[in-house]
From Swiss-Prot:
<dbReference type="Pfam" id="PF03129">
    <property type="entry name" value="HGTP_anticodon"/>
</dbReference>
<dbReference type="GO" id="GO:0006427">
    <property type="term" value="P:histidyl-tRNA aminoacylation"/>
</dbReference>
<dbReference type="GO" id="GO:0005524">
    <property type="term" value="F:ATP binding"/>
</dbReference>
<dbReference type="InterPro" id="IPR045864">
    <property type="entry name" value="aa-tRNA-synth_II/BPL/LPL"/>
</dbReference>
<keyword id="KW-0648">Protein biosynthesis</keyword>
<keyword id="KW-0963">Cytoplasm</keyword>
<dbReference type="InterPro" id="IPR004154">
    <property type="entry name" value="Anticodon-bd"/>
</dbReference>
<dbReference type="InterPro" id="IPR004516">
    <property type="entry name" value="HisRS/HisZ"/>
</dbReference>
<dbReference type="InterPro" id="IPR006195">
    <property type="entry name" value="aa-tRNA-synth_II"/>
</dbReference>
<keyword id="KW-0436">Ligase</keyword>
<keyword id="KW-0547">Nucleotide-binding</keyword>
<keyword id="KW-0030">Aminoacyl-tRNA synthetase</keyword>
<comment type="subunit">
    <text>Homodimer.</text>
</comment>
<keyword id="KW-0067">ATP-binding</keyword>
<dbReference type="InterPro" id="IPR033656">
    <property type="entry name" value="HisRS_anticodon"/>
</dbReference>
<dbReference type="InterPro" id="IPR041715">
    <property type="entry name" value="HisRS-like_core"/>
</dbReference>
<dbReference type="InterPro" id="IPR036621">
    <property type="entry name" value="Anticodon-bd_dom_sf"/>
</dbReference>
């Protein structure tokens, strides 16, 4: 067997990449309107960043990180998520000293050693936002609203917003003990992962997918019942704001998310068409993470979307039609090939997409290839056209065509003509 992409990774070929480009364009437009600014951080970071930021007891840190030593024996890790790197950059570059609230977004590959399955890979891509510097419940409502705007703009129809509060540290400490006390008598009946988590990270047992564990957890104490008055007030304000924005939600007391840094609001968007793996966006508030990583006390909230899962949904839907013509240059003969190359470059400078057939194959095959790649218009320069300085313009959908001087195509009149043939100009 020859060389292949490593297990858990995949190539994104051009036919699929158009869906990624569409997704990225939609996201950029919405994030720009909401005044979020893009940030890019390294693909690998110092390992302690994730150990301290995500939590050593989490599955991500204990089981799933790609960690290695460089030639100077420094421990480095391919980023398993985006928030820790953004927070590190926020601290390192003193963004907090600029005052006000920082609205940031990122997009890029992440890495986790997981069992590959549909929509889940060891190299995967996330779109994420972080709002740093605001404890206001309006920030919680805003990031949820922005996420919903993106998902709805992509055409997702079966969305459900799951909402919970994980409280502050004191709330969780009291609840953690109550949960351990409840689960300990059932330890032998829990799935192996939950047994391991019982004293290390018991809150993660709440989102176990094992049916027997789920049945036990169903009767467990609820974290919502252990919230302080302050935590409860924050959560109630978030709910009130979501209602004011017309955003429906369901309270899910078992929703805790998989990272240790979350406080107060935790949420997920699920798309039911993806079944049990239906989470397409998840996030929450992390009011202590900046301080824990060496920065000043800074409340913050954010979310991340798994793009592979969104692409699974997008590929079942037609993309919006192109509003720009896709021109395909077909030539025969040395003079025509030269003129075709020059004309194509001139048209590209005018803003058109122009594909030049470089195969040297027969005329008919070149025209068939134009149709196969999705071109809207075929530009044909044969030997006679090369002699006359003309070009045949052929609309592939209708088969209509017209002979015009090559330089006429550079006029503004042709911007609309390329999209729709004009009666009176056509020869058949």
């Amino acid at each position: 067997m020859g060389l292949q992409a490593p297990r858990g990774t995949r190539d994104i070929l051009p036919a699929e990449r158009v869906y990624w480009q569409y997704l990225e364009t939609i996201a950029r437009q919405i994030l720009d309107r909401a005044a979020y600014r893009e940030i890019c951080t390294p693909i690998f970071e110092q390992t302690p960043l994730f150990e301290r930021g995500i939590g050593e007891a989490t599955d991500i840190v204990s089981k799933e990180m790609y960690t290695f030593r460089d030639r100077a024996q420094r421990s480095l890790t391919l980023r398993p998520e985006g928030t820790a790197g953004v927070v590190r950059a926020y601290i390192e570059h003193g963004l907090h000293s600029q005052g006000g609230v920082q609205r940031l977004w990122y997009l890029g590959p992440m890495f986790r050693y997981e069992r590959p399955q549909s929509g889940r890979y060891r190299q995967f891509h996330q779109l994420g936002v972080e709002v740093l510097g605001s404890a206001d419940p309006r920030a919680d409502a805003e990031v949820i609203a922005v996420a919903l705007d993106i998902l709805q703009a992509l055409g997702l129809k079966q969305l459900t917003l799951m909402l919970n509060s994980v409280g502050d540290r004191e709330d969780r400490s009291a609840y953690r003990q109550a949960l351990v006390d409840y689960l300990t008598p059932y330890k032998a009946d829990l799935d192996p992962d939950s047994q391991e988590r019982l004293h290390r990270n018991p809150l993660r047992i709440l989102d176990s997918k094992d049916p027997r564990t789920q049945a036990i957890v169903k009767e467990a104490p609820r974290l919502l019942d252990y919230l302080s008055a302050r935590s409860r007030a924050h959560f109630e304000q978030v709910q009130s704001l979501l209602q004011a924005l017309g955003i429906a939600y369901q309270i899910n007391p078992a929703l805790v998310r998989g990272l240790d840094y979350y406080t107060h609001t935790a949420f997920e968007f699920q798309d039911m068409s993806l079944g049990n793996e239906g989470t397409v966006c998840g996030g929450g508030r992390y009011d202590h993470l900046v301080e824990e990583l060496g920065g000043p006390p800074t409340p913050a909230i954010g979310w991340a979307m798994g793009l592979e899962r969104l692409i699974l949904l997008l590929r079942d839907r037609p993309l919006p039609a192109r509003n720009q013509p896709y021109l395909y240059m077909v030539t025969r003969g040395a003079a025509a090939e030269r003129q075709g190359l020059i004309l194509a470059q001139q048209l590209r400078h005018q803003g058109y997409t122009v594909d030049v057939d470089l195969s040297g194959s027969a005329f008919g095959k070149q025209v068939k290839r134009a149709d196969r790649v999705g071109a809207t218009v075929c530009l044909v320069i044969g030997e006679s056209e090369a002699t006359d300085g003309t070009v045949q313009v052929k609309w592939l959908a209708s088969g209509e065509q017209v002979l015009v001087p090559q330089q006429e195509l550079l006029s503004e009149n042709w911007r609309s003509r390329f999209l729709t043939p004009h009666d009176g100009l056509l020869s058949h």
